[in-house]
Amino acid sequence: MSCDCHPHVFGDPGKFPDRNPNPLQASREASFEDALRMHEAVGFRRGVLVQPANYTTDHCCLEEALARIHRGRYRAIGIMDDMVTDAELARLHAAGMRGVRFNFVRMFKMAPSPRLLQSSIERIGQYGWYIKIFIGPEELPNAIETLGAITAVPVVIDHMARLKPVDGARQEAHDLVLDLLRRENFWVLLSNGVRMSAQTSGYHDVVPIGQALHAAAPDRCLFGTDWPHTHSHNEGGGPPESKLIALLYRFLPDAAARQAVLVDNPARLHGFV
């Protein structure tokens, strides 16, 4: 069963208010039911819901979504800080959480301290969770030593590290990501190519990047829609998910690669059976 490894859900703002004092964009409702309809329309049978930055460590909306249709088909990724208790971690694991996300992108002002990152890794290790890293080429050189030292848990690099296609394989960040993917515990999410592209259609400039990342770690690549595209530059909220999947297919050489990225790899990482 195909898996979308990176949708977000937003509940009714009256019930689930923003917790981030400086959100880049106010939440607009995009319910779990809406996400399910999108998944059914494009053929996803599994999903990994990612906690929006707007909610910080308040996972109530995410927990409610998982409770509605967990049934072994959906997992979740949360946000971690020192205020998250051991009891919360146990409850979130039982609900379906399988990892935590750290945001290094400067404009969000949410980068973790090395101490928080290390303590979080130690705390989630008992559950077999992984960490997701949202980072871009501007932040990667300064973070590479910290990231390279992570060996105890799997690490998923979100959104192809937001690599810039205008620089192609010559940019420093491109080589740094490939170096990380040579480590057996590093994975990459082949997503957000449309936003990375300097083109308004076709998105040919990001195809070599996706192909290179897949070639570096074909058994550790995932895909995510990033629905509902909350920070899209387009008023319409981003391209149809069918276009995102079509772009993914251009990264992958054959049907076996598509099976791995959409079905086998996410099942192995998230414990789907």
Residue ranges of model-derived segments:
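Mid-to-C-terminal alpha-helical segments outside catalytic/metal-binding sites
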Residues: 1-3, 28-46, 218-220, 234-273
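Mid-domain alpha/beta scaffold segments of enzyme catalytic cores
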Residues: 1-127, 204, 243
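Active-site environment of divalent metal-dependent phosphoester hydrolases
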Residues: 10-13, 54-57, 83-84, 107-108, ...
